[in-house]
């Protein structure tokens, strides 16, 4: 049976590297998978991603607008890419899903987790990942890592207090969900790889 796997974490936590390990694992077992990301994943969702992260317009994006654009993209992503793949028996691995909105917008932007829960219950009730791996990193370290890769986007410019709030929500979500696992992303790459494989062994 196909699995929906989500990698979560702050910017600079090493999600792309972790997804590479998951791909290596699934390939070793000859298991088909689609690899995708949020915000984005489909043409429409990628357009919304560009607005949310870069905003080339001379107009401030209100936090509520940011949230709803992300959810519009997420609905497109799930209905047009994720759900069809799972129906065909293909595994899906996503760099972020709705936990990122709960943590970043609900916590970081201080919009409130209750508002996010209403959106999830209304639009994504049947969109539950089978496995969520959260990579935990100190925000200062994560932002320093992300800064070495490229220019910071709108969200990466939000400041340490924003990311401290975001991290706290992520950790509370892990604690409340039986299908979620936290990995210390400050460990060596080899240790992280082994921990990811140990988690995947429980599902495949």
Swiss-Prot record:
Enzyme Commission number(s): 2.7.4.9
Catalytic activity: dTMP + ATP = dTDP + ADP
GO term, biological process aspect, one: dTDP biosynthetic process
Enzyme class: transferase
Keyword ATP-binding: yes
PANTHER family, per database record: THYMIDYLATE KINASE (PTHR10344), UMP-CMP KINASE 2, MITOCHONDRIAL (PTHR10344:SF4)
Function summary: Phosphorylation of dTMP to form dTDP in both de novo and salvage pathways of dTTP synthesis.
Similarity field: Belongs to the thymidylate kinase family.
Protein name in UniProt: Thymidylate kinase
Gene: tmk
């Amino acid at each position: 049976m196909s699995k929906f796997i989500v990698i979560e974490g702050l910017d600079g936590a090493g999600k792309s590297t972790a997804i590479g390990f998951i791909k290596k694992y699934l390939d070793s077992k000859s298991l088909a998978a689609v690899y995708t990301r949020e915000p984005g994943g489909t043409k429409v969702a990628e357009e919304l991603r560009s607005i949310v992260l870069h905003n080339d317009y001379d107009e401030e994006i209100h936090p509520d607008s940011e949230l709803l654009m992300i959810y519009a993209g997420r609905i497109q992503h799930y209905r047009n890419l994720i759900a069809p793949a799972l129906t065909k028996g293909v595994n899906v691995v996503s760099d972020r899903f709705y936990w990122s909105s709960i943590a970043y917008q609900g916590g970081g932007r201080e919009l409130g987790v209750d508002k996010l829960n209403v959106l999830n219950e209304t639009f994504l009730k049947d969109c539950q990942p089978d496995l969520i791996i959260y990579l935990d990193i100190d925000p200062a370290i994560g932002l320093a890592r992300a800064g070495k890769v490229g220019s910071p986007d709108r969200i990466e410019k939000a400041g340490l207090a924003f990311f401290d709030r975001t991290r706290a929500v992520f950790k509370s979500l892990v604690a409340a969900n039986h299908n979620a696992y936290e990995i210390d992303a400050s460990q060596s790459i080899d240790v992280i790889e082994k921990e990811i494989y140990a988690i995947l062994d429980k599902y495949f």
